[in-house]
């Protein structure tokens, strides 16, 4: 682990929970022999972030008619609207229901309805707070480990004090809960001080994140770390720093950390404009499709392999192979 930390990249190993989820089970291969597999996808809106844009596109590309699917995707950040969409897909007689939940709670009834109807439920991106027997399998990011990776990086900077601004994502989402937990645990252990605790709201808004930092500056808060739970919010936070003339990045006063691995964010890290970015891979569709078509399911919750990169470890290959969305180009800073 120490060796990996020195180069700034930590592989978050793919893990399987000890609780079996239909171990060795078989998934149906379609509504009828030789027909298209009917799939309902409940997801968040692509406007939420660069991560979500890539995730929505991945789902659309994989679950296409060309690949043997009759799929529809609903995109909303409202949990009640997501639940209503899931209920609609069940009534429509889908074979499989894929869910990335806006909020981790409130899903028991619809999941139990899916089970009674014989609909296979696959979670992606985020876990739901429910009994594992209520879904078939899951392929998700380990948000808690992402948060621990980020906080270990912060603590490893050997700052004389750590006064941190925490900018959370959508409150109650699996991503927010996991990533925030590490910062809150470090605070409770007396390792850091959280001088401002805000959120980008349900849309993980750049503008709302900027307001959190602007308010901290106006209030005279002394801070030296921005812990923003996605790249867009990190961008908004840095806009506030720039407007106030506060230095940041590799040689600046304030360390800036984001999540998701958008290529613009990685180029900012490479340029020393930001300090660190944590990967959260949006590409789950291909693996779930393999599960469905093969009929062979994993024995539990599968966590994706993910990495992080800082100014000491970032390379063009990392940006090319792991980054999301358009690449602004080497040396280009996105403000």
Q: Which residue ranges define each predicted feature?
A:
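Short, solvent-exposed amphipathic alpha-helices that sit
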Residues: 50-67, 146-150, 174-193, 208, ...
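Hydrophobic alpha-helical segments within soluble ligand-binding/sensing domains
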Residues: 39, 82, 138-164, 178, ...
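Hinge/cleft segment of the Venus flytrap/periplasmic-binding protein
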Residues: 26, 35-37, 167, 171-175, ...
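Hydrophobic alpha-helical
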Residues: 91-116, 183, 198-267
